[in-house]
Amino acid sequence: MRVLFYYRGSEHIGVQSIMAYLKSKGHLVELIYEPALGDNGYIDIPFLNKFFYNEKLLVDKAVRFRPDLIAFSIITNLYMPIKKLARKFKQVLPDVPIICGGIHVTSLPEETIKQDCFDMLCLGEGEGAMEDLLQRMREKRSYNDVKNLWVKDASGHIHKNDKRPVIRPLESLPKP
């Protein structure tokens, strides 16, 4: 399966870990990473920021990759711009499910799942949940009961699944 990850800001070990895990399971993963220099408080020159953030280029890259799944990791200060970008992705790739995780999602799942641009949430560790999700997608089976996921079905019902045990030892995961 083809998974497109998006992250903005600084490097993110959680995203890198999930990507490494999925690669080790044979999935093709791609990262759209934006340094977002204007977000850090050191560089705030609106004229220059437009050169570092180009929504059309991001959307074009997503379309070229042809993902089966789009994944976002969200921290609260980036919730609004990520929601805007997810809506753009949903417009051009309407049949591609969008999943998001991260500290914002774990802290505010009820608010996040209400958004029309997000199809599912991952609460807690994503490695096993993402692998189970992709396996079910490949087999064209329902993934409404995958642990660690909240899944919004076609009728709008939200399936809030239990959490899975944490991964121990962490050294069992591939290195990012």
What are these regions (language model features)?
Residues 174-176:
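Pyridoxal 5′-phosphate
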Residues 7, 19, 134-138:
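Short, amphipathic alpha-helical segments that act as regulatory/interfacial helices
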Residues 2, 31-169:
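Glycine-rich beta-alpha loop elements in corrinoid/cobalamin-binding modules
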